[in-house]
A protein has these predicted regions:
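Sec-dependent N-terminal signal peptides
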Residues: 4-13
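Low-complexity, acidic/polar, glycine-enriched regions of mature
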Residues: 17-203
Length: 203
């Protein structure tokens, strides 16, 4: 119980503590959500084959850990909790792209003004190579309870993926009621633990 209380206190006072060391687990989950029908119903999925290379495994701040980190994603390995749908997406969408990998790199990070006892938030700039085209995407991040999550939006038209979109829309025309959207939500998550903080108790 004492360890739990100390961990919570350390998290709440992290912005006021000095000498913290942030440690990244090294694992990363990459997820996405595509949309279908005029009601814009979301279909969530995850990539299951990811090679993540952190800029550093530990550092004094998020920037030291994350800026410069890279990820390579095998789009042939996905999970939407429906194996038939997985096969269709791979065959009729991902295999219609110019390559079967997505490459990403965090190139910049800007933190929002810190509000005590609230999650850390800000914006990441991610250089993304998708369908053999490279663009920089902003992603909003949030850090709370040792969990770092970033989310953004990808427009398939920006990456010249119209042919792949047309392919999946045609294949799933009835299920999607004739509409598959070009915007896709993307996100990633990793665990970051704050250790060795110099915490000063305040009365």
């Amino acid at each position: 119980m004492k360890k739990i209380i100390l961990s919570l206190f350390t998290l709440f006072t992290l912005s006021d503590a000095g000498g913290c060391v942030l440690v990244q687990s090294g694992d990363m989950n990459v997820t996405w959500k595509a949309y279908k029908t005029l009601a814009k119903v979301g279909v969530a999925g995850a990539f299951t084959s990811i090679k993540y290379t952190p800029a550093a495994k530990e550092g004094a701040n998020f920037r030291e850990l994350l800026v410069g980190s890279t990820v390579s994603i095998d789009t042939m390995q996905i999970n939407t909790n429906n194996s038939t749908r997985d096969e269709t997406l791979v065959k009729m969408f991902f295999k219609q792209l110019k390559n079967t990998t997505i490459e990403g790199k965090i190139i910049a990070m800007k933190a929002d003004k810190r509000v005590k006892r609230k999650p850390y938030t800000g914006v990441l700039d991610v250089e993304l190579n998708f369908n053999d085209k490279t663009l920089t995407l902003p992603m909003k991040y949030r850090y709370e309870n040792e969990h770092f999550v970033a989310e953004g939006m990808l427009d398939l038209f920006d990456f010249a993926a119209q042919d792949a979109l047309t392919s999946i829309n045609k294949s799933c025309y009835d299920l999607h009621k004739g509409k598959t959207w070009n915007d896709v939500s993307i996100g990633f998550a990793t665990n970051i633990k704050a250790t060795l903080c110099k915490v000063e108790l305040k009365k």
